[in-house]
Amino acid sequence: NFDILGCHNYEYEPDKYKTGVRRIEEYLMKLRNYVLKSAHPGIKIAILEWNLSRTYDWRAGMHAAGSLISYEKLGPELEFTCPALLMRNTSDDPTWTAWIYHDHVSWFPGGGYVVEKLFRQHYAEIQYASTSGTFREEEDPFTNFIDSISQFKPVDWRPGTVDAIATGSADGKRIVIKAVNYEGIENTLITRIQGSKVPENATVKIYTIQADKNEKASLDKPDKIKPVESSMPYEKDMKITLAPYSVMVLEIVGK
């Protein structure tokens, strides 16, 4: 008998930084459902190693964002995840990439490290909703889409363009929306916040990481890829512009 079933989830081709997320998520969903229907439904899944393993540029960052969103969607059956490799010396074989690169005196982060640190800083344990893909924007999405969602027919559906998840803290004081835009064009995320505990007044802070998909940090420029903080007015219905090739964390804190 065993308690945890460990997996390795690597994407080996850098240009599959977004399609690899979907492939791995579909596999993990099937594995989770198989375990739940088995004679041992209490077995937990763990991702012992994962990464976009052949590059540490910003594609690895977007892949990390999509992967972490997928892992949150899997729910309590996923016990833990661990990216790999953690650290490499800059003189090592570059074939296998890492989260952190160093020489004998300094270091710089790979694209995945920057995203995982941001997501960890704004983690919220209760999952509310998630979405994937985009479609042609409506003139009034809150009326035409959200208010009539059961009858809505998305036009020009494009899967694999955006992944997003909304979570909240156990005390109900924070709502966190995390999203990744895999495309080289702007996309829009529309949100409606509702429920008995939704604050009437709140602050909204946005943390955005944006770069060309092939950009990467270095010993000379360790802060080449980093979050930029901004804010926006709080509304229960919000349209959020996702910059090209970007990862965004939006945090709402009730007053």
Go through each PLM region and give its residues.
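Aromatic/acidic polysaccharide-binding cleft in carbohydrate-active enzymes
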Residues: 46-163
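C-terminal beta-sandwich/jelly-roll accessory domains of carbohydrate-active enzymes
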Residues: 143-159, 180-255
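Active-site proximal loops enriched in glycine and acidic residues that flank catalytic Cys/His/Asp
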Residues: 9, 49, 82-85, 104, ...
